[in-house]
Amino acid sequence: MDLYEYQARQMFKERGVPVLDYRLASTPDEAREGARELLAEGASLLVVKAQVKTGGRGKAGGVKLAHTADEAYEKAQAILGLNIKGHIVKKVMIASGADIAAEYYFSILLDRSNRRHLAMCSR
């Protein structure tokens, strides 16, 4: 499966896995409106994230924090159109932020040469 982050979140949500709320935006104005909604619902921190099917978004400038709707607009404006490893950012996800102590990456891959699934986790 080759999914954008927002698609994976939606699948988790539909199956009862708790996920932080988010909005999807194709323009800075949509990002500002989505941020306003999340802030009105109680979010105190927002994360504006490039939606591209590649890793390294944060290092490439595709993940930025915002505290206000206007900041979310500015961050979305900077991210939309960005080229991340050959992928042009056409959408951003504005998500409620969380206070995290540690971050992990988890993936299940198909190892075609051995005809098995491979679980990978890193910190």
Set out the residue ranges of the language-model regions:
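A conserved helix-loop-beta module that forms one wall/lid of the active-site cleft
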Residues: M1-E37, E41-S44
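Active-site cofactor/substrate anionic-group-binding motifs, chiefly glycine-
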Residues: A40-V47, V63-V89
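Short beta-strand-to-loop capping motifs
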Residues: L65-T68, S96-I100, L110
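Flexible glycine-/small-residue-enriched beta->alpha junction loops
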Residues: I108-R123
